Amino acid sequence: MSLRLPQAISIQPRRSVGERLAVAIDRAQSFLRPRTPFTALNTVWRHIDREASSLLDVGCGRGEPMRFLAGKLRLSSTGIDIFAPYLRECQRGRLHGQYVLGDVRRLPFRRKSFDVVLCMEVLEHLSEEEGAQLIETLERLARRQVIFTTPVGDWDQHEFDDNVYQAHQRIWAPAEMKERGYRVWGQGLRNLGGLSGIQSPLPLLLRPLVDVLWVLAGPISHSRPELAGNMVCIKNLGREAT
């Protein structure tokens, strides 16, 4: 399905020089992280169902995870996001097979439409009630596997990129996801995540040092997500993924 958006919508959000540099750093990190053990995308890659033939990327954003996954998995993928400029970036990069401009709180898909439903860094942008509803909805849409990644601990973030949906509303705890039947792995170190992000209060040159600490903490927080700054949550609905 080809996505057609009004021409009046700007492809590139307005960013300050600092934000543009932070985005460039973030993209460099996006290349390195999936290839680094104990990071979120590396964990997703190790546990994703290899026999899946279809994937829904919920809140796909700029599509950075699919830059890595699409080159390794042979499946049809659909990306949905509410923010048109991000979706345009994905479309230009051909990161998914098709795109839907829509709200993750009202997903327009039928029950059991996809083998795998991937939802990376979305839960924290919703209220507690909306997040709980999203979890239940994605479990209805998936045939085989549901995958979430979301921050742990303090991770303050306000809107940026002219995108009001970027603000964090509610942070989930590993125990809450385990109670819902998810296997949970941690990454990084609690309360460090926001120090390396686009809205970090630290000078740009210091943020890579935070990333080094984040990676070094990986072997410990991976099996102890309550100590982590981010978590990967996976529920296999069919047989165990390989």
Please name every model-derived segment.
Residues L3-S10, E19-T39, E64, I82, ...:
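S-adenosyl-L-methionine-dependent methyltransferase catalytic module, highlighting the catalytic core
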Residues N42-W155, C233:
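Conserved SAM-binding loop
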